[in-house]
Swiss-Prot record:
Protein name (Swiss-Prot/TrEMBL): Ferric reductase transmembrane component 4
EC assignment: 1.16.1.9
Signal peptide: 1-18
PROSITE patterns, sorted: FAD_FR
Function field: Siderophore-iron reductase responsible for reducing extracellular iron prior to import. Catalyzes the reductive uptake of Fe(3+) bound to dihydroxamate rhodotorulic acid. Fe(3+) is reduced to Fe(2+), which then dissociates from the siderophore and can be imported by the high-affinity Fe(2+) transport complex in the plasma membrane.
Known glycosylation sites: 51, 80, 101, 113, 127, 135
Organism: Saccharomyces cerevisiae (strain ATCC 204508 / S288c) (Baker's yeast)
Length: 719
């Protein structure tokens, strides 16, 4: 990723070094501007003596303009202060040395002289050598026409701002609810039946029984469905966007500015869709970034912001298509297509739209899942090119501020990311192969203040020639043995994790490697604020919940009033071996540990009946596309023949834990936890189906127990 970051930086640097500064956006629907332009349109059709139609150079024409401005101003109830703003508008309109040097007093003198000699507008064809008064009906029609034109110019900026404010408002509301965690108000609120019915039916559950697990239609269309909460946020945004695209266009029934209603509609719709498209840029860049201040405020997962990022990108592209189609129709009507298509801004507009389409096309779930590194490289390069073409498209028009904001957000995110990496430097990590496909990574911390909270994650770059530019997310734990060490457990899949696993295997099962670690990311969990905590861990999603168990067990052991249960679902003993030190640290703590092994080992467990829930496989590495794939467990022979694993975990080592053969029944376990008095937090990280089951069962428990405070805290992330 380092190379594509350099390319994107160079493109952004080129933007800042442009030959001429781009035009600033200004709101133009002011009385003085409407009046000046409407008066000009009415007066330019007259035949002025001596100077023809040169209104700004012929005194009677100038006096007529000033009188028209005066009538419009006082007719609308404005004061002389507004009239003087009209004088300034006329200076800029004519923009000659004479006008630029005229004082307000000189404007008033010219107006007084013109008023003294003013006459009614004559019939057409007469050579005019005196100031005239425009026909009142026509003057008002011209004024209204320009009011509509400038209104349609300005209103999209307000609409774009409202869309940004909508998402900021949602995040502030989520942040307020998060703040209530530190007050007794939330406990009272979450014990209200109405509140819990709303939570159980609308905000907690998945949309169609799936969220972490990707949906598939005809094995071609795949992707991740949002949760119901995310769906509500997206639905609110789509409703707003639809209203803003369809609401309150001001049309001119007299066709003073546009020759036909078709041209007027095409122009207004195209302009509005273009501004709304650009208004999405800051949010799109912000939501894709790792250092998103709205994520810090709201406490929402990065996964949720990626969902919003995708939908904003899709609607931005739709707006761009409408924008392009509208202006194409407009110029075809005026028969200017062959001329305008050769202009530079038009060519950059086409390039911008094509790049937006490519960004979306190469972001489909199937492509991300199978070619994630290619997707990331293309996405960054296309995004940089997209912003560059956007810049060139509007450099002589308006809307550049949206691009300024997007680039500023991108730049701040990169600076913070570099700072995070610098805090740890490039430490050398000890890598140890566990079983056939797990690698335990131990990293010494050079800084004492660097601490990973339970459930947090880091982005790791393995500094090897074949993969140093790649950056992948992994759950991180502070070592329970040495507080100056970090621990990461990764599962080898495809790509970089497979390269790392093969490297360690070639080194005899143990190796050292330089890493670049960026993080930690993710907010501190609120699980410690609940009376009871149920920790559900599946597969290689164990590190997060086990970190919670270690912290909760230490803080609650003295009081003994809390019920903390850690439920671990594994296939074989490899994951237990990888986290053996952390598991052994639970001994003597106030944590009930239940381990479900769905793969029967030859000499490791008694046979205990258990109910089933569908099982998949996940990983502490939250790889954006690969998390959705179920992975086959290695065969028993693979486990027993590999000489590179740690000493096998045995029943005697974990005598404090209760072992089960089979898969955990999440519903039954959850119902048992609900029976304990007090509030309950359910923390889950595991295979996609396991996570979705836990989410939906928790939502049902909230509905069944509307007077209890039950919260679901999910640590699984996929994008």
């Amino acid at each position: 990723m380092l190379l594509v970051h350099i390319i994107s930086f160079l493109l952004f640097f080129q933007l800042s070094a442009a030959k001429a500064p781009p035009s600033k956006t200004s709101l133009i629907n002011t009385h003085e501007r409407r009046s000046i332009y409407s008066c000009y349109v009415g007066l330019r059709k007259e035949t002025w003596g001596f100077n023809g139609s040169a209104i700004c150079r012929y005194e009677p024409a100038i006096q007529s303009m000033l009188y028209c401005l005066y009538e419009d101003t006082h007719e609308k109830g404005y004061s002389n202060k507004t009239l003087e703003k009209g004088f300034e508008e006329m200076r800029q309109f004519c923009y000659t040395p004479k006008f630029l040097n005229m004082t307000d007093a000189e404007f008033y003198t010219s107006l007084d002289n013109g008023t003294y000699y003013i006459q009614d507008q004559p019939k057409a064809g007469i050579n005019i050598t005196y100031p005239i008064r425009l026909n009142t009906t026509l003057r008002k029609a011209y004024y209204d026409a320009y009011y509509g034109y400038y209104y349609n110019h300005d209103i999209p900026y307000y609409f774009g701002g409202i869309i940004c404010a909508y998402f900021v408002g949602v995040m502030l509301l989520a942040g307020l609810i998060r703040f209530l965690n530190y007050t007794p108000i939330k406990k009272i609120m979450f014990q209200q039946k109405l509140v819990n019915y709303v939570r159980g039916y609308t905000t907690l559950p998945t949309l169609y029984e799936k969220h972490a697990e990707p949906f598939s239609y005809l094995k071609v269309i795949t992707g991740y469905l949002p949760t119901r909460f995310e769906t509500l946020v997206i639905l609110g945004y789509l409703i707003l966007h639809t209203i803003f695209m369809a609401y309150k266009y001001q049309y001119d029934p007299y066709h003073i500015i546009f020759a036909a209603h078709r041209a007027e509609v095409a122009h207004f719709v195209a302009y509005r869709s273009g501004i709304l498209s650009f208004a999405h840029l800051p949010l799109i860049v912000l939501f894709a970034g790792r250092n998103n201040f709205l994520q810090l405020i709201s406490g929402l997962k990065h996964t949720s912001f990626i969902v919003f990022h995708k939908w904003l990108g899709r609607m931005m592209f739709l707006d761009a298509i409408i924008h392009a189609a509208g202006f194409t129709n407009y110029y075809l009507y005026y028969k200017k297509w062959n001329t305008v298509r050769l202009r530079v801004y038009w060519k950059f507009g086409i390039a911008t739209t094509c790049l937006a389409g490519m960004l979306i096309f190469f972001s489909i779930a199937a492509f991300r899942r199978h070619y994630y590194e290619t997707f990331m490289a293309l996405h960054i390069v296309f995004a940089a090119l997209f912003l560059y073409t956007c810049w060139e498209h509007v450099t002589n028009f308006s809307g550049i501020e949206w691009i300024y904001a997007a680039i500023a957000i991108w730049g701040v995110d990169r600076i913070v990311r570099i700072t995070r990496i610098a805090l740890l430097g490039f430490p050398k990590a000890d890598l140890q192969l566990v079983g056939s496909d797990l690698v335990r990574v131990t990293v010494k911390k050079p800084k004492k203040f660097w601490k990973a909270k339970p459930g947090q994650y880091v982005f790791v770059s393995f500094l090897r020639p074949l993969c140093f530019w790649q950056s992948h997310p992994f759950t991180v734990m502070d070592s329970c043995v040495n507080d100056r060490e970090l621990v990461i457990v990764l599962k080898a899949k495809k790509g970089v994790t497979k390269l790392v696993r093969n490297f360690v295997e070639r080194k005899g099962g143990k190796a050292s490697m330089r890493l670049a670690i960026e993080g930690p990311y993710g907010s501190k969990s609120t699980a410690h604020r609940f009376d009871n905590v149920l920790l559900l861990a599946g597969g290689s999603g164990l590190p997060g919940p086990i970190s919670h168990a270690l912290e909760l067990g230490k803080t609650t052991a003295a009081s003994g009033k809390n019920f903390v249960q850690l439920v671990i679902a594994v296939r074989g003993l490899d994951m237990l071996n990888a986290c053996k030190k952390e598991l052994m640290a639970l001994k003597g703590l106030n944590v009930q540990v239940h381990i479900y092994n769905s793969k029967q080992e030859l000499a490791s467990a008694e046979k205990i009946s258990s109910n089933e829930v569908k099982n998949g496989e996940t990983t502490a590495e939250k790889a954006p596309s690969s998390l959705s794939n179920s992975e086959k467990a290695p065969s028993e022979s693979e486990n027993t023949e590999l000489p590179l694993s740690l000493n096998d975990t045995s029943i005697s080592d974990l005598e404090f834990a209760t072992f089960h053969v089979g898969r955990p029944n999440v519903e039954e376990i959850l119902n048992e936890s609900v029976n304990h008095s007090g509030s309950l937090a359910v923390v889950c990280c595991g295979p996609p189906i396991f996570v979705d089951t836990a989410r939906n069962q928790t939502a049902k428990a909230v509905i069944r127990n509307p007077s209890r405070m039950i919260e679901y805290l999910e640590e699984y992330q996929a994008w």
